[in-house]
């Protein structure tokens, strides 16, 4: 069964590219251009979440959303990867309970390796 990857990023170009890449690799991409709520994530119940740290127009940062996800019993086992162009991403990921991080711009091979690691 195809794994569902929730991508939350305010960059339309990144969403478009990831949609193509993930679909070609056999995943089901679920794309959100703005932030989403924990309740919405409960309904979607993805197998992996790629979460931008800075989401324009949303009151919470990606790491705040990640922390909320990890506090929810039914969502806490879903792997979350933070994504950002920021340098200090490793510490932010650790602090919010994320499973890892990816720096922008993406290296597609590294991205797919991380995705496969968490969706095996």
Model-derived regions, located:
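Receiver (REC) domain switch/output surface
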Residues: 111-120
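Short amphipathic alpha-helix used as the core "switch/output" element in two-component signaling
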Residues: 61-76
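Alpha4 helix (beta4-alpha4-beta5 surface) of REC/receiver domains from two-component response regulators
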Residues: 61-64, 86-103, 113
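Active-site beta3 strand of CheY-like receiver
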Residues: 44-55
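Hydrophobic/aromatic residues positioned on beta-strands within the core alpha/beta folds
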Residues: 81-83
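Receiver (REC) domain switch/active-site region of two-component response regulators
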Residues: 107
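Short hydrophobic/Thr-rich beta-strand motif most characteristic of the beta2 strand and flanking loop
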Residues: 26-35, 40
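Two-component/phosphorelay signaling modules centered on CheY-like receiver
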Residues: 12-30
């Amino acid at each position: 069964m195809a794994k569902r990857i929730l991508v939350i990023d305010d960059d339309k170009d990144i969403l478009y590219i990831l949609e193509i890449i993930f679909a070609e690799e056999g995943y089901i991409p679920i794309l959100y251009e703005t932030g989403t709520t924990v309740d919405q994530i409960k309904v979607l119940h993805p197998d992996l979440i790629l979460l931008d740290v800075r989401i324009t127009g949303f009151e919470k940062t990606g790491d705040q959303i990640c922390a909320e996800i990890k506090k929810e019993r039914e969502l806490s086992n879903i792997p979350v990867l933070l994504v950002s162009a920021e340098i200090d991403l490793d510490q932010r990921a650790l602090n919010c309970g994320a499973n890892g991080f990816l720096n922008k711009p993406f290296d597609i091979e590294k991205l797919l390796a991380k995705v496969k690691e968490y969706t095996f």
